[in-house]
């Protein structure tokens, strides 16, 4: 079928019931309860342990990720789903982290080791590393950098992140991307970004590249929070000299695959929804909260729905995405490859906020979807504490590429305290996951996916390009997405 794309202002805020009569609604309630029960009684934690402990870090383009993808495909098949495939994408550059070391040389009495790692998808330092005086930069506009050219040349640049990103990361992002070539042209030896998490625990800075898996043009490193504060204190007393070196492995284009498993609908098989989470993780972590929990929720939703005596009305495509961390590479490629089918995509349900106390759903700025869920949740998710709906527009994970095409998008919303504590850190391990919250979150995802797929009517229309643009502008995401290459006004 073809969707009539309508402008945002014309959307009625009333929810067209997903079921046509009381008997059908009662049957759907019963089936939703069966789906939830299957997830709650299922082996979520055991699967998460196998994914994270057996395969470890799952960086896009590495053998560890490929093995995890094959495992994910086998899990879908074991659930009785026959239509399972690996959809390959090409990442422009393969990248793997090597060793790194860094020292503070002056003005301390003896050189002191610093906590530092390369950021991802950056080239290695020159042989022997880089060493020089530190200069703090708080304004990365081209005019400010060129005005301070003499202070930047031959120096190691430490970002004053509080001021650099004072206007918000999304607004500053275009300047950030443009600044790399300017720093290189001005002769900076390298850039150092302070981490924001205590105890010198290192993670990996997000989105500092162009989101396409391309190699950054100069050495860029992340330094522990306390080490950065030490350098800033010492700079108030005089010059500070540090050095760092690291070696990364960089190859040419590499292939990496998303895992797609489809349960074909029995009434409207050409209409489909996506239930997805990313399978890849940063290499510094085993990716339990980010996003092993989400990947297992998708696997368990597939298993639970496949266990019902009949398939849903619409088809459901379960997706374990590759390449989310370096830039939504898998989901973006899927949307491009299946562009001619997108008119038939009813909704996308995504989970990439870890396993925490459930709150509800983020609906990417859509008032009509907020109204839909407020009508639906009390019927089918009563008792799951998932009754809140956020109008926040994020575009920070794999529902984003679908949302840009006006497709209704639902991102699981949970309390993110536990998630944020370990996000992209080496401490993002299985023991940080609360099993009860994990299973409850998984049941919520599975039930919403099934109810949307089983409804007599689509949960909502596709938005027009202009309506999506209105949402992005309101969220102040338009400039970021234009610079990122994801959006054309």
Residue map of PLM features:
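Noncatalytic luminal/extracellular "stalk/propeptide" segments of secretory-pathway proteins
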Residues: 24-33, 37, 49, 53-156, ...
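Extracellular/luminal Protease-associated
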Residues: 62, 114-219, 286, 388
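Soluble metallo-hydrolase cores and metallopeptidase-like ectodomains found primarily
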Residues: 27-31, 117-147, 208-288, 300-303, ...
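Second-shell loop/turn segments in exported
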Residues: 32-40, 53-63, 132-137, 146, ...
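Metal-dependent peptidase/peptidase-like ectodomains
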Residues: 220, 228, 268, 321-421, ...
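Bacterial N-terminal signal peptides
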Residues: 7-17
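His/Asp/Glu-rich mid-to-C-terminal helical/loop segments that flank catalytic regions of hydrolases
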Residues: 303, 307, 420-489
């Amino acid at each position: 079928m073809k969707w009539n794309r309508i402008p945002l202002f014309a959307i009625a805020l009333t929810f067209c019931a997903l079921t046509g009569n009381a008997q059908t609604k009662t049957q759907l309630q019963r089936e939703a309860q069966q789906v939830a029960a299957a997830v709650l009684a299922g082996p979520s934690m055991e699967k998460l342990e196998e994914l994270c402990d057996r395969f470890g870090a799952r960086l896009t383009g590495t053998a560890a990720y490929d093995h995890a993808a094959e495992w994910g495909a086998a899990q879908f098949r074991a659930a009785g789903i026959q239509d399972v495939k690996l959809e390959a994408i090409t990442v422009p550059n393969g990248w793997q982290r090597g060793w790194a070391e860094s020292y503070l040389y002056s003005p301390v009495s003896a050189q002191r080791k610093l906590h530092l790692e390369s950021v991802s998808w950056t080239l290695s330092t020159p042989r022997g590393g880089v060493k020089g005086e530190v200069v703090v930069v708080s304004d990365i506009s081209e005019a400010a950098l060129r005005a301070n050219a003499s202070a930047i040349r031959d120096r190691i640049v430490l970002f004053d992140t509080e001021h650099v990103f004072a206007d918000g990361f999304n607004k500053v992002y275009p300047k950030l991307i443009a600044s790399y070539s300017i720093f290189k042209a001005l002769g900076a030896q390298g850039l150092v970004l302070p981490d924001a998490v205590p105890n010198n625990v290192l993670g990996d800075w997000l989105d500092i590249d162009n989101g396409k898996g391309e190699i950054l043009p100069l050495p860029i490193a992340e330094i522990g929070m306390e080490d950065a504060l030490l350098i800033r204190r010492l700079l108030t007393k005089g010059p500070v000299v540090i050095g760092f070196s690291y070696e990364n492995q960089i190859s040419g284009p590499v292939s990496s695959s998303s895992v797609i498993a489809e349960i074909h609908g029995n009434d409207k098989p050409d209409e489909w929804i996506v239930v997805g989470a990313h399978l890849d993780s940063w290499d510094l972590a085993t990716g339990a909260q980010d996003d092993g929990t989400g990947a297992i929720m998708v696997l368990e939703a597939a298993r639970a729905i496949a266990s019902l005596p009949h398939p849903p009305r619409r088809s459901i495509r379960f997706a374990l995405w590759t390449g989310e961390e370096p830039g939504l590479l898998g989901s973006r490629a899927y949307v491009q490859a299946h562009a001619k089918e997108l008119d038939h995509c009813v909704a996308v349900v995504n989970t990439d906020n870890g396993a925490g106390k459930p709150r509800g759903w983020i609906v990417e700025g859509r008032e009509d979807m907020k109204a839909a869920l407020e009508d639906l949740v009390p019927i089918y998710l009563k008792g799951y504490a998932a009754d809140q709906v956020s109008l926040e527009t994020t575009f920070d994970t794999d529902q984003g590429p679908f949302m840009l095409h006006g497709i209704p998008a639902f991102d699981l919303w949970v309390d993110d305290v536990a998630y944020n504590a370990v996000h992209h850190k080496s401490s993002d391990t299985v023991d940080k996951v609360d099993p009860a919250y994990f299973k409850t979150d998984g049941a919520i995802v599975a039930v919403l996916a099934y109810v949307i797929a089983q409804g007599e009517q689509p949960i909502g229309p596709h938005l027009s390009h202009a309506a999506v643009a209105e949402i992005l502008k309101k969220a102040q995401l338009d400039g970021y997405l234009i610079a990122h290459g994801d959006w054309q006004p």
